[in-house]
Each structure stands twice: as structure tokens, then as C-alpha cells.
């Protein structure tokens, strides 16, 4: 059986502190997703990224902006399911 690649929203961070702050924020607000190792398609500093469904982009970025939280890159990439 071949594993399928599906679109995923990935928010990458420059520092581990930024990643942990975002994870804490998203969890506290009940926003979907999880922390993953940064995919090879993205180049950013700390090696951690938040993965969620692409349709969650606006909610996640709005939460980061409202909290004044920093992130390096936000893009949709194809990841193995």
C-alpha cells in the first residue's frame, strides 16, 4: 500500500521558545494541530513546526497575531498522511 501525500499547513519557528509559546497558545485556545519536526521542504531555525489542516490557517495566524507571537514561515506543503 502506498502512503498518500496530503496538504498540511505548517507554521515554523526560529526558536524553540517561539514554538513552545505557540503550542501553549494554540492548546489554551483549543485550536487544532500538533507540533512536528520541521519538514524538509521548509528551512527555518529551530527544527519545530505546528501542523494543522490548511483550512485552519486564518484561525492559527489570527491567534499568533493577537498574542504578538512570532513565527518564521507559514505555508501549505504535501506531507505523508
Named regions from a protein language model:
Residues 1-7, 78-81:
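Short, low-complexity, intrinsically disordered N-terminal peptides in bacterial proteins
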Residues 4, 28, 69-70:
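A generic structural signal for short, non-catalytic loop/turn and secondary-structure boundary residues
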Residues 7-62:
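Amphipathic, hydrophobic secondary-structure cores in small proteins
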